[in-house]
Amino acid sequence: MKRKSEGRSSWAAATCSPCCSLTSPSVKKIRSPTQQDPRHRDPQDDVYLDITDRLRLAILYSRPKSASNVHYFSIDNELEYENFSEDFGPLNLAMVYRYCCKINKKLKSITMLRKKIVHFTGSDQRKQANAAFLVGCYMVIYLGRTPEEAYRTLIFGDTSYIPFRDAAYGSCNFYITLLDCFHAVKKAMQYGFLNFNSFNLDEYEHYEKAENGDLNWIIPDRFIAFCGPHSRARLESGYHQHSPETYIQYFKNRNVTTIIRLNKKMYDAKCFTDAGFDHHDLFFADGSSPTDAIVKGFLDICENAEGAIAVHCKAGLGRTGTLIACYIMKHYRMTAAETIAWVRICRPGLVIGPQQQFLVMKQTSLWLEGDYFCQKLKGQENGQHRAAFPKLHSGVDDISINGVENQDQQEPEPYSDDDEINGGTQGDRLRALKSRRQSKTNAILLTCPLAVLTSALCSVVIWWIVCDYILPILLFCLDGFGT
């Protein structure tokens, strides 16, 4: 352990230990001169964590000085999470992709071949968590580390990170950890959800914007989550409202065959059905969890859909994420925490409040249903699968869990459109916030080049005034003095 005054220079001159020995990752903590107890780290200590022999993650409490053999960089103000409330991460899929490309480019750069690459973050614990998330994803995706190996590298010693929370207003009693996120990424790669070789960054960043449709793929070629359309396109109450026609051509191009609406009717379903889509309504209240009947209905529709399924509620966050998560848990046996982590990486804000605990509660039963589903399909030819679905679904209803059979439950009262007041629900607030936030970001991006252009024009005008008016007068005066 070295003091701050000697830490950086000595590290820069030293050779980093390779991280192929993953069971004992290396860490350097730079202690303050006043700290004497080696068992506890001062919160203001700088920390360096070895990722590979050339790559490190650093938590620094003062900006590092450049060196000839060390390249420092930070993404704290470059890849920023756009929060809804007190949520702060994890960063979305496009940011993970951008980060991985950045690291690969730096490691392969001819000008940096002899340099150590240090990704540093500052004192903000939320930024630290997102920096660790990005580095961990890079280890899992490009270095072939297991989630546990990546996580162990990041928490070596007493280094810790705050967990991620949901987008709900108020207190939070459910969190997802970095390890949950790494497991989600690993399983997404395993099941083909995540493949950066075919990832379309431009498409992701275009369509996730509120003004361009506010949609994200959760499972490529299978599930889209998007905000609820309205009867006509307009800008109202601070957010963009899109009509069904906005989505029809894109859905057709991407082989979407089924639309599932989870909120009250804001548009005529005929807009989609007349265009050749199947359209289904499964209403339940904004911010609530679905009944077993709704979960079963959703799974039945998805398992019988010929193509991709586009799901929406009002904001395309809470209800939408919850039911898509149920499908993922049933058919891919991911845990509730892993599933929540994955859907939020794809579309930040998904699954809100009590819907998180609902998924934890449903995990075991959904796994059992998935096992039963697979057993029924096993041994059957592909051509027989479709005919087997109705029988399978009726069989799933009779599964017994912990010795208690699934019996018919009393249906809830029909959902009323009056349960959602225009402009007053959680979904309204979330989508309005997202739309205003992105509009502000776009305005900033537009303002920067305009400011540069304005400054350049002002310089030209000033130079023109000097050359055409002031300079001749000065020359005339000087000539007069000379004579």
Curated annotation (Swiss-Prot):
Membrane topology: Single-pass membrane protein
Catalyses which reaction(s): O-phospho-L-tyrosyl-[protein] + H2O = L-tyrosyl-[protein] + phosphate; O-phospho-L-seryl-[protein] + H2O = L-seryl-[protein] + phosphate; O-phospho-L-threonyl-[protein] + H2O = L-threonyl-[protein] + phosphate
Locus of motif Nucleolar localization signal: 1-53
Sequence segments annotated as region (A): 43-197
Residue intervals passing through the bilayer: 444-466
Region of interest (Linker), ranges: 198-211
GO MF terms, alphabetically ordered: protein serine/threonine phosphatase activity; protein tyrosine phosphatase activity
Domain Tyrosine-protein phosphatase as annotated: residue spans: 213-373
One Pfam family named in its UniProt record: Tc-R-P
InterPro entries associated with the record: CDC14_C, DSPn, Prot-tyrosine_phosphatase-like, PTP, Tyr_Pase_AS, Tyr_Pase_cat, Tyr_Pase_dom, TYR_PHOSPHATASE_DUAL_dom
Keywords associated with the record: Cytoplasm, Cytoskeleton, Hydrolase, Membrane, Nucleus, Protein phosphatase, Transmembrane, Transmembrane helix
Location in or out of the cell: Membrane; Nucleus, Nucleolus; Cytoplasm, Cytoskeleton
Region entry B, spans: 212-378
EC code: 3.1.3.16, 3.1.3.48
PROSITE patterns: TYR_PHOSPHATASE_1 (PS00383), TYR_PHOSPHATASE_2 (PS50056), TYR_PHOSPHATASE_DUAL (PS50054)
Principal place of residence: membrane
Active site: C313 (phosphocysteine intermediate)
Region (Disordered): 1-45, 407-426
One annotated Gene Ontology cellular component of this protein: cytoplasm
Domain notes: Composed of two structurally equivalent A and B domains that adopt a dual specificity protein phosphatase (DSP) fold.
Note: May act as an autosomal functional substitute.
Name by which UniProt lists this protein: Dual specificity protein phosphatase CDC14C
Organism: Symphalangus syndactylus (Siamang)
